Regions:
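Acceptor/aglycone-binding surface of glycosyltransferases and processive sugar-polymer synthases
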Residues: 69-87, 92, 104-179, 206-216, ...
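Short, well-formed alpha-helical segments that are part of the catalytic scaffolds
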Residues: 13-30
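Hydrophobic helical membrane-anchoring modules
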Residues: 1-3, 173-236
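Hydrophobic targeting segments
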Residues: 2-8, 17, 24, 37-42
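Short beta-strand/loop segment that forms part of the nucleotide-sugar
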Residues: 8, 32-46, 67-70
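A conserved acidic beta->alpha catalytic loop
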Residues: 43-52, 100
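Donor nucleotide-sugar binding loop of glycosyltransferases
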Residues: 13-16, 46, 74
Length: 236
């Protein structure tokens, strides 16, 4: 048995959610041989019709689980999704975002290599979010190397397949409202010398909706990250 949980956070994605679900639902159908795999989207207190559309989609798609929580940001929503998948009995957790920037056709290459690794992380060699976001990612990788001594090509790609037991182990090191869990997940997997690889993925520009993270927010998050990294380093 290898129950797979594909999990995504969603915030104000009414322009994208239906297309995203249509794209990813066939993936979970294909990998539901045991009957225990699920596609899970966690609504982060959206102010639009995202959650309503999710509920409507679930009526005709039994493998889709729509969840909702008060707004707490992308990081806390990802942690919520990981925790739900673990408690639901997932063996494997695949995380991506609900904005349509990732390609479900690239999932199979990850899945087919799962037996060789504890985690397979996406590597965005071309970032559809533009040069500023690509620069931010390079800075993140430099900081991860500086604080934790690990070298990674992409610390935060929202396209990652991980063993649930490992995610559970590392999730316990993070507060429920921590805002950069994927960066730390990547860091932990590499730092503790788990079997890890990075695979190149495509990453399209956002076609619809508005990115809730702008440069001003990135700077604020970055300032907090420096403090958090110092504290998290003490607990390695």
């Amino acid at each position: 048995m290898e129950p797979l949980y594909i999990v995504m956070p969603a915030y104000n994605e009414e322009a994208n959610i239906k297309t995203t679900l249509d794209a990813w639902y066939p993936v979970i159908e294909k990998h539901n041989k045991t009957g225990n795999s699920r596609l899970v989207v966690v609504n982060d207190g959206s102010k639009d019709n995202t959650y309503k559309m999710m509920q409507e989609y679930a009526e005709a798609h039994p493998l889709f689980v729509p969840l909702t929580k008060p707004n707490g940001g992308h990081g806390s929503t990802v942690i919520f999704a990981y925790d739900y998948a673990i408690k639901s009995g997932a063996d494997w957790i695949f995380q991506t975002d609900s904005d349509g920037q990732t390609n479900p056709d690239e999932f199979e290459d990850f899945w087919n290599e799962r037996d060789n690794y504890d985690a397979i992380f996406g590597n965005r060699t071309v970032c559809g979010d533009g040069k500023s976001r690509a620069f931010v990612e390079k800075v993140v990788c430099m900081l991860v190397k500086h604080y934790f001594g690990v070298k990674v090509p992409d610390a935060n790609a929202p396209f990652r397949l991980m063993r649930a037991d490992k995610v559970s182990k590392y999730l316990g090191k993070l507060k429920p409202d921590y805002n950069l869990p994927n960066i730390m997940m990547t860091t932990y997997f590499v730092y503790y010398k788990d079997r890890v690889t990075f695979k190149e993925i495509s990453f399209k520009p956002r076609e619809k909706g508005t990115n809730s993270i702008n440069i001003k927010k990135i700077i604020k998050i970055g300032q907090q990250a420096l403090k958090d990294f110092r504290e998290l380093k003490k607990n390695l």
